[in-house]
Amino acid sequence: MFGLLGCTRYFESDKGPRVVLDKTDFVMGYHEHIGILAAPGSGKTTLTRLLCGLDAPDEGDFIGLRGDALPLGANSFILPGLTGEENARMMASLYGLDGDEFSHFCYQLTQLEQCYTDRVSEYSVTMKTHLAFAINLLLPCRLYIADGKLYTGDNATQLRMQAALACQLQQKGLIVLTHNPRLIKEHCHAFGVLLHGKITMCEDLAQATALFEQYQSNQATIQTEDYSFDI
């Protein structure tokens, strides 16, 4: 099993501790594909970092091992002074993988063509994201975590990436954190909502969407009231 038990994560602010996750429980099997609806600023990135073992909770327990989960599309490991090919081969070497096969896969999936041998510092944001996605797909892990989105680029690029991910998901799990119900409908079979620092699992996507939309509606009402005034 993998996840969090009674985990709290907070950050200090001028107004005191800001609680992002509040004694939340989230446990799953390694082959499950779970979509969690979450509004911007609700703690998606904080949750991703905890589940990937990059941060430790202030309270509670992390179930699993560091390296079990990989943040899909994260590109902080890519070195801008190296070419795309050099970055791919470097990561293959670090994990003891075949450099030729690894690099060939990244070249084929990204279709960067001649740019593959250019320095990453010359890449656009989208090109760098595509390279990171390809590299992450081949790194050893037991499940992927997507924070916000899965793919970028034109339709052809997204179809290639979707097919490559589908192959990996035959043996690996997936967690998608997003505000877009359509994204998790395509890739997940269990659904939840991140609200008020806790994850609530739902019976189906319809229930999760209804709960999420109700929360957004309530937040919009609160914001409207905050800006109201008497004339």
UniProtKB/Swiss-Prot annotation:
Assigned protein family: Belongs to the ABC transporter superfamily.
NCBIfam families: PRK15177.1
Biological role stated in the UniProt entry: May form an ATP-driven Vi polysaccharide export apparatus, in association with the VexA, VexB and VexD proteins.
Keyword Cell membrane appears in the UniProt entry: yes
GO CC annotation terms, alphabetical: plasma membrane
Membrane-topology descriptor: Peripheral membrane protein
Localisation: Cell inner membrane
Stated name of the protein: Vi polysaccharide export ATP-binding protein VexC
BP-aspect Gene Ontology terms: polysaccharide transport
Binding site for ATP: 38-45
The ABC transporter domain, residue ranges: 5-221
Pfam families hit by this protein: ABC_tran
Gene Ontology molecular function: any one: ABC-type transporter activity
Keywords: ATP-binding, Cell inner membrane, Cell membrane, Membrane, Nucleotide-binding, Polysaccharide transport, Sugar transport, Transport
UniProt source species: Salmonella typhi
Cross-referenced InterPro entries: ABC_transporter-like_ATP-bd, ABC_transpr_TagH-like, Bact_Polysacc_Export_ATP-bd, P-loop_NTPase
Principal location listed in the UniProt entry: membrane
